[in-house]
Amino acid sequence: GIARRIVDFASALIDFVTGALGCVSMLACMFFGALTGSGMATTSAIGGMMIPEMKRKGYDSSYAATLVCFGGIVGPIIPPSLSFVLYGASTKTSVPDLFKAGIIPGVMIGLVFLMVNIIICKRTGTEVHKPELGPGGERIPMIQFWKERLHRVGKATKDGFWALLSPFIILGGIYSGFFTPTEAAAVSVVYSIIVSLFVYHDMTWKDLYKTFVSAAVLNGVTSFLLGTSTVFSTFMTFEQVPQM
């Protein structure tokens, strides 16, 4: 439910350009990556919705999959990022500083991918849009076009408000000192559960149980990697390997 509302919001912003679905996929990956901090979760959630739709619009299957995979890479660069938390814990680097360092590069990479997608779609003739023309091919005034566009963006923002609010709560809490980056992960999970169960009603208690089981398996793998990498990092420091 949260992923679908993020896609609807991204679609309202940019679905009038050439290669709109590809751009929506990339933009949705950026938003969803900022919400979850996980490239795997971003690719799975957005790809499951957008790849079949892109194929129906004439996109090549491999191109559609590649586009979503790139979006899954960009999403975790934009804070809050699980990769940054793991890197900071392993190398004793400040996680808030890593988050700050990831904002501009993440946004810039995402915008470059958007432009590349538009150029490729123009060259291949895939999903070419002319925003000045209406559904029947009639020319519409630009004032009317932007008025309708703003109305749609406003509606999508209202519908997806609670989903879009999550990154601001997480980052605001971290930078204000209200909670640590580690605690922010717990806040994000609790917030998402509350929104999905009681606000959007998109998740059942049975779905929540399955989610907990899946998360436990993934966290087991991640914890093992983090533990071994921390031991290896400490060993390298004690043996002064970087100074050799």
Question: Which residue ranges define each predicted feature?
Answer:
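Alpha-helical transmembrane segments of multi-pass membrane transport proteins
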Residues: 1-244
